[in-house]
Amino acid sequence: MSRGLLSRIATTLVLGCGCDMTPADSGPDAGPADAGPPPLTIEWSACTAAGGEVPAECADVAVPIDWADGEGPSVTVFVKRITRPDTTGQLWLLAGGPGGSGKDFESAIEEIQALASDLDLYLLDHRGTGGSDYLDCPGLVPPLGGWSQLDPARVTSCVDALTGNQADALRATRTTQAAQDLGALIATVRGPNDRVVVAGASYGTYWLHRYLQLYPTQPSAVVLDSVCDRCGQWLEYERSHDRLGRALLSECAADALCASKLGADPEAFLQALVSSATPVCPDVVRAFGTSSVKVMAGVLLENPFAQHYLPAFLYRLARCEPRDVTALTTLLSRRTSGLSRTSIATFLQVSLADLAPAPPISEVEAFEATALFSKELDFLTAIAGPVWPAAVPDPWVGSYAETTVPMLMINGVLDPQTTIEEARSFAAHFTGPEQYLVELPRTVHGAVFGSATAAPPADPMPCGAEIMRLFLQSPGTRPDTSCTEDILVGDGFSLGPEADEYLWGTTDIWEG
């Protein structure tokens, strides 16, 4: 079983981007920025990736806290590279969140190398995350009952600590500063004949787009996986989860077997679990890490495999007999441990400083009172917003890059985090002859590796990854997308006996 499959079985990062569109002009003139930043000093040392299995090189690189003041203090950003003989350039990978780091790609290193066989890989940690100077608030962790249970005093303590110990770094943890870090790093390490491809996922596409605004001619090509334009509308993000989740339950109601388990009204079945006055199935709560059934449902909805099994998960969660606990904990054990430690402080800083204002708490409470699917990030930002330090508005926000570089935009039609409607709206601004939007049916977030064409434990290259591979081979040619016809379709709410046995430990996902 490859790390790539495990990463696709993994529950998606708790922090993913939700987006909204704001029509605008192209923003400030790229001007001197695109001419290239001054070179940086980089000293590489031996390290490893993918849990020690892959040799790599790492560097802590000092960059200006504020690129507008190159003589001022510095902050450290962390970059890891995986090189191979006879490559022709570099593939830079930008993680999502905001708050995730380059480590999020390491569980799929083998698969990424397969689709970018002639490129060295560079994993850059955004300011405030991973191995970069980390914005840390140890007390700001998800409450067991969900972000709705967050004590505002914890946010106040976090702000006090950050403004006391990391005030300059906090102010400079912004998308535009991170984009300038990327441009300077590429300018420093790029060889005279290297081609450079930059790929971002989720919030990483927002970061990548800001980079394109600043350096519209620097990269050879770019890939945007799960397109995130005007990110951070966290109430709309949760509404999208609820809408798509309810649509799935409607499919259950129309399926004879599923309806025989959850009843004629599956929404009522889930509502009873969400509203339960007593904890639901404590052993599963411990394995999942939350007691909120609504949050569990929201997280599972994002997973390319777990979404097929969501009705069976709810059915067994409600019954909670020993056989159910065994099956559910087996399913949850298929998650991988290769993801980075997400910086909640960086999530809040970038969300509130660069993406969108916090939603009004009254609107959040009104929506969440009836929601069945939600990760409650709307609660997190609504609670934190009133006490988080105000930021200077960024003039690049709401505008679009003017670039002709080859661009692959790829998005799942069933993505609850970065919706297909938002991807289409974003793509309308990039209509060059080598700029393509590819829509993947039956696919959720993380479309490149979340578009399986076979059920586990089989592990062929996913459709999105194959399309990206073809694009990297020939960015000037529209990639063949015929594999979209082969993207996995479940049999009702199962992926078949072999997958059921592997994921659940039984071929009877309802009763076994």
Place the predicted regions along the sequence by residue.
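Ser/Thr-rich, Pro/Gly/Ala-heavy low-complexity intrinsically disordered linkers and tails
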Residues: M1, L5, I9, L13-P37
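Gly/Pro-rich cap/lid or specificity-loop segments adjacent to the active site
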Residues: G36-V293, Q349-G512
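Short amphipathic alpha-helical segments that mediate assembly, nucleic-acid/protein binding
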Residues: P266, L310, D324-L328
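Structural motif
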Residues: T278-M296, L301-A306, S337-A345
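Short helix-capping/linker segments at secondary-structure and domain boundaries
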Residues: L301-Y315, P357-S362
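Short helix-adjacent coil turns
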Residues: P304-F305, C320-R323, P475
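Long, low-complexity segments enriched in small/aliphatic residues
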Residues: L317, P322-L355
